[in-house]
Amino acid sequence: MTETFQFKLLAADGNARRGEVVTPRGTIRTPAFMPVGTVGTVKAMYLDQVRDLGADIILGNTYHLMLRPGAERVARLGGLHKFIRWERPILTDSGGFQVMSLSSLRKLNEQGVTFKSHVDGALYHMSPERSIEIQGLLGSDIQMQLDECVALPAEPDEIERAMEMSLRWAERCKVAFGDQPGKAMFGIVQGGDIPRLRERSALALRDLDLKGYAVGGLAVGEPQEVMLGMLDVTCPVLPADKPRYLMGVGTPDDILKSVAHGIDMFDCVMPTRSGRHGLAFTRYGRINLRNARHAEDTRPLDEQSSCPATRDYSRAYLHHLIRSNESLGGMLLSWNNLAYYQELMAGIRKAIEEGRYTDFMAETMEGWQRGDLPPV
């Protein structure tokens, strides 16, 4: 078993990259989609199912896990991998995004952020050092720096202030992380929708010589072209021999286009959240199972899929479950959606290897635009 953390670039097609992130707990095939296991569970899914779908890594949320059950308790129980029965790599976010969203419950300064728990109102302080300590107690394989994510739109001065403080926090996180063989700490590029700030952030983080780099503060309501424009500014500045992670993204369309701009890793709650609300992602595009047109449709979502939820259950039954608010409906659609996301990533990787990513993008988007088959 390797004791090192490394990124191997295996192929490229334009700016799209096919690689591997090698860790002691397993290899992450990139481009990769990481299902979100916020509180130690990918909602509505058994982790055995998530594993069988082809996920090489999942994400855990530092903010939620530090509040309940508590990082120290997880450590006493053997770490997050043992606690949730997941032997493959885990990435933990820093908790910063959730804390920053508690605008009425938190106070921010150079030392960190003090906030009230949304669970019981207890007061907590999270510094860059404490964030890394918590992630260490959880035992994750990839840990994220604490950063300040400014909601867009925002004034340029406010975006710049938050970006500069995030850079100082990145330096403190690097010191706190130290040298942990087989593990990595990623820095997070900030700068809102201002190209010069994105470039400044990426250059400064590159100089820290971290093991990986994330792009944060995007997919927060700005137009897709703005997000892609920020990737155009950011990715060329980041080291080619380190993985690039676009945080919180996103839709299949976002992923497809972001890969073409040089991104290697993604995470988003969209597959499971959408599933719980009756939405299915398929190669025909997005299907709303709440719609009455599915009430007597005996076809599955996609008979060619290898996922049982996609292949074996009729749309009429899925429609019935969703309209009846049965939990099984959300479970089956979450299963379908995560299966589709992993199938999409497998197709992306294969297309890059074959040097036909542009064609793959066009074919995939054409399938979405063509849409679902006519109702029976």
Swiss-Prot record:
GO molecular function list: tRNA-guanosine(34) queuine transglycosylase activity
Chain positions recorded as substrate binding sites: D93, S94, G95, G96, F97, D147, Q190, G217
Enzyme Commission number, as recorded: 2.4.2.29
Record carries keyword tRNA processing: yes
Annotated stretches, region: RNA binding: 248-254, 272-276
Statement: the UniProt record of this protein carries the keyword Metal-binding: no
Pathway named in the protein's UniProt entry: tRNA modification; tRNA-queuosine biosynthesis
Active site per database record: D93, D267
Keywords from the named record: Glycosyltransferase, Queuosine biosynthesis, Transferase, tRNA processing
Entries under InterPro entries matching the protein: ArchSynthase1/Queuine_TRR, TGT, TGT-like_sf, tRNA_ribo_trans-like
Pfam families according to UniProt: TGT
Annotated GO biological process: queuosine biosynthetic process; tRNA wobble guanine modification; tRNA-guanine transglycosylation
Entry's Gene Ontology cellular component terms: cytosol
The reaction(s) this protein catalyses: 7-aminomethyl-7-carbaguanine + guanosine(34) in tRNA = 7-aminomethyl-7-carbaguanosine(34) in tRNA + guanine
Subunit: Homodimer. Within each dimer, one monomer is responsible for RNA recognition and catalysis, while the other monomer binds to the replacement base PreQ1.
Family as reported in the entry's similarity comment: Belongs to the queuine tRNA-ribosyltransferase family.
NCBIfam families per record: Q_tRNA_tgt, tgt_general
General function of this protein: Catalyzes the base-exchange of a guanine (G) residue with the queuine precursor 7-aminomethyl-7-deazaguanine (PreQ1) at position 34 (anticodon wobble position) in tRNAs with GU(N) anticodons (tRNA-Asp, -Asn, -His and -Tyr). Catalysis occurs through a double-displacement mechanism. The nucleophile active site attacks the C1' of nucleotide 34 to detach the guanine base from the RNA, forming a covalent enzyme-RNA intermediate. The proton acceptor active site deprotonates the incoming PreQ1, allowing a nucleophilic attack on the C1' of the ribose to form the product.
Name of the protein in question: Queuine tRNA-ribosyltransferase
Record organism: Rhizobium meliloti (strain 1021) (Ensifer meliloti)
